[in-house]
């Protein structure tokens, strides 16, 4: 039997739907001519993003604020169960792992302080097993000295990335304000600190250093929000999913990025469902379990911090009642993601499933083959996309309620996605900015390649 060929796809056409290496693996499965194996590979790709580990080494000299930074990134207080130990003296004697409270596959490692008397740099690097970490946060409470430049050089030698996190800038600002009250300028002081750190890091061999000035006590100020978003942006494709979902939603930008990442999962989950339902392989559809839908929805719920533990923790941090935060949540999944709730939503989504499928078919005619095989793709896509949008909006409302921000709904609304964008485009309403085609086009391209390969396979068998 002749094997089917899945054409190569330009890299820029696959960055939203799936990473390049994922598509290559999928193409290999299709070229083998084993369609059930290809469908199984799709499920594996979806599951991989849920189990990818991320190891982050947090290093620096003693007393730099490493433990406090870890707590801030994990969204926990110093007295919360499982928080990294903090103190005025060195409290970390050996590498200590701190899994994220909600995502245990993401681990921040609190490394012992470097530069201690009697401990050479080489000995320190060996003791903390410097090579095991995916990337680093290099933390310093001062303007980058010999300890920091030595660590920076070693990280660069290993071919890895790091971000220089200058902590306790609030203390520097307060001291400068007291010393020079008449000519004090916060922006000027921060720029002076940044320039000095950049100069020292360039001397260590880093051409374009990433420097973040933060206060661990004020995660909404200075460069802390930028640290969070930059961390996500620079993660390799196979680490990005785990890293993003672990980040606290301290800014609207971080919330939007989290929603964009989960949007990829909506497409993958719907694609798996549609492919399996369309395949004429006995018993294959049964392998696609409703448990996957429940797990996806629970993942959205947890990722946006809408679960009871997250709401209670946020309420304590901002001095409000958890009930006040919960009062602005409107999603029917706010209380529980149960099989009964999912079944009801699934049934409701079936009403609009064919409309969504036909909207995709108008852009990619060959998609009709999949539509003819069943409406599972449209149903799953409609349901998950609607729930994702609702939960993202709930997370936005909770954020506004917690911080009491004076923002209008229009000013802070997250970018619309899913059915609304498809419907607007198919009906000719709105501009290209209102209904971006990039995600739809990428999904359509992959579906076209898959379905074309099936068609060629069928024709060769007929001959």
UniProtKB/Swiss-Prot annotation:
Family matches, as InterPro entries: G_IRG_dom, Immunity-related_GTPase-like, IRG, P-loop_NTPase
PANTHER family according to UniProt: INTERFERON-INDUCIBLE GTPASE, INTERFERON-INDUCIBLE GTPASE 5
Keywords, sorted A to Z: Cell projection, Cilium, Flagellum, GTP-binding, Hydrolase, Lipid droplet, Nucleotide-binding, Phosphoprotein
Pfam families referenced in this protein's UniProt entry, alphabetically: IIGP
UniProt key word Hydrolase: yes
Catalysed reaction equations from the record: GTP + H2O = GDP + phosphate + H(+)
E.C. number: 3.6.5.-
Transmembrane parts of this sequence: none
IRG-type G domain residues: 52-234
PROSITE patterns named among the record's database cross-references: G_IRG
Residues reported in the UniProt entry to bind GTP: 61-68, 86-90, 168-170, 215-217
Subcellular location: Cell projection, Cilium, Flagellum; Lipid droplet
Coiled coil (UniProt feature): none
Function: Required for sperm motility and therefore male fertility, via positive regulation of spermatozoa fibrous sheath formation.
The keyword GTP-binding is assigned to this record: yes
Record region (Disordered): 409-438
Record Gene3D superfamilies: P-loop containing nucleotide triphosphate hydrolases (3.40.50.300)
GO molecular function: GTP binding; GTPase activity
One GO process term, biological-process aspect: positive regulation of flagellated sperm motility
Homology family: Belongs to the TRAFAC class dynamin-like GTPase superfamily. IRG family.
Residue numbers carrying Phosphoserine: 246, 303
Name of the protein this chain belongs to: Interferon-inducible GTPase 5
Record gene name: Irgc
GO CC annotations on file: lipid droplet; membrane; sperm flagellum; sperm mitochondrial sheath
